[in-house]
């Protein structure tokens, strides 16, 4: 079981990469080096199915464009007593075949059969742009 989430405030894959690289050091003290942490309000009820084998699929500009492996899920309580879930993510951002996705609130579960496939290592910028255009037209 995977997760899918809107990447709010980010307009491209490259911007997400930059954001991740700039903020990785924020979490060193809590979770170690080379991780990215996304804090969300709700702990997944299906966490046992996800840790170490799932990814979070990022929706940017109305399309799923990449995924990031989930290493683990950790409970967090802020100083005011509110409970959260820290999603500890591997540093890798893996491009996927662009797949259209309408806006939604929060995160959602994503079945493995519904997840877009990863792009091959030999994909180039032209094929990415073409795939994005075809996805916008609903053809892939």
Annotated model-derived regions:
Residues 3-5, 39-40, 61, 67, ...:
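Generic secondary-structure boundary/loop-capping signal
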Residues 11, 52, 129:
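Short, well-structured alpha-helical interface segments that form or flank functional binding sites
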Residues 21, 25, 75, 136-139:
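Short, intrinsically disordered, mixed-charge
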Residues 24-66:
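Short, well-structured hydrophobic secondary-structure segments
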């Amino acid at each position: 079981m995977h997760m899918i989430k809107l990447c709010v405030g980010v307009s491209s894959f490259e911007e997400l990469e930059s954001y991740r690289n700039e903020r990785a050091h924020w979490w060193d003290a809590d979770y170690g080096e080379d991780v990215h942490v996304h804090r969300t309000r709700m702990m997944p009820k299906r966490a046992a199915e996800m840790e170490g084998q799932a990814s979070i699929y990022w929706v940017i500009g109305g399309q799923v464009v990449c995924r990031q492996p989930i290493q683990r899920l950790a409970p967090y309580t802020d100083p005011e007593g509110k409970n959260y879930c820290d999603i500890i993510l591997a540093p890798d951002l893996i491009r996927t075949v662009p797949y259209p996705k309408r806006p939604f609130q929060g995160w959602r579960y994503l079945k493995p059969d519904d997840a877009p496939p990863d792009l091959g290592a030999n994909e180039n910028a032209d094929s990415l742009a073409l795939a994005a255009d075809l996805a916008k037209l609903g053809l892939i």
